[in-house]
């Protein structure tokens, strides 16, 4: 599988593979067995440029405040219980296996970054549209039977955008709460409290109680159990490995980990309660709805979109435009809807269709490479995943703390989720046909998405992402703008979008991003 990532100075391509699951015998704690996910690029040991002592006061997304979920005071560092915990760390370090040392190195680059990689791999694995049934029609993935055929979920672009946003937002609130309690109790790491313990991960003066590794693992495993239930075994093992690595490395004791795990799971429960009622369960609609959408377009005198799959496939999540956004109300979504596309009977539409045909018939090698680079179709981490991949490099190079990194991904992914909601609301409001529907002689260069054309999802996602990243990393603004434009035009090169789709999508994504940026400007983070 070919994934791509861009960075200032040009595109950087790298190959990643689907999750490789290695079997292991015995419990992870006992054996240190790595039921591995990856492979991923090596992350340098995390040595944050700031401890972010005020992060506990930064604005929450869903929690009412940093102390909403109580964390009991830890035992004193002079207590017999804590001394016994330190002895347990020393004992574990005296018998470390090479597998355990590899786990320490694997997680030492930061849990937020590592889990972001894992989520992208899960999206890629499950981003597979169901195959048609022998008798015709298509089966629907069932959350109640995630191991069935087809497996649940079908991690299409908007499912992926929602998944990235829930994981990132939950991690961010959980870590802000953890930071609040860390600086309430100020218990230093084991390696700081006992010089007989070797620091195998970079150790700072950041308080260790509750453990940020355990907080991240706890909140993430609970979110992913719901979002990717068929992967529950490997997700659970990776989360346990992260916590164990923190103990083996001398960064956390058992009570640091227990407190962090409980906090993370409690925060996840808040986010999962929201997810259960955000409208996603009914986003697929029904045949009656699908017909009504087509009839509405026809009644306006337009040619209605139809599926080009054989047999015709139901439209992809036509009610996703009604799924709850993070920083926009339903009224905001409607108010920001782009103006109508060119009429299907207009000269402009004829001209734009002709431009698509002319472009794909005279495609240069560079244009084809751009179309493929930004394809992000079935079997990949999706357009939102592409921007997460880009973002990881900037976060890594900035040496951000876990809570600062979580803020970046939360802002990015909330904006892209909201962009997906807004884009899908427009797509199914206008129900505009694809270029190859109006002119079947157009030969697309990439897969044809199974939903209406206007506006371009790539353009909307990319504009929202570029706007947020330009705020977070101002020095990269020109690069982000270039990637936004390249992602948009790639859809014309691929033969699947008109120019109007692209330009309207970019403008729409820019407007949607302002809602998340308003949150960011007032969240208290320096």
Task: Label every model-predicted segment.
Residues 34-526:
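Acidic/polar surface patches and capping/hinge elements
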Residues 29-32:
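C-terminal motif of bacterial Sec signal peptides marking the signal peptidase cleavage site
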Residues 1-14:
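N-terminal secretory signal peptides that target proteins for export/translocation
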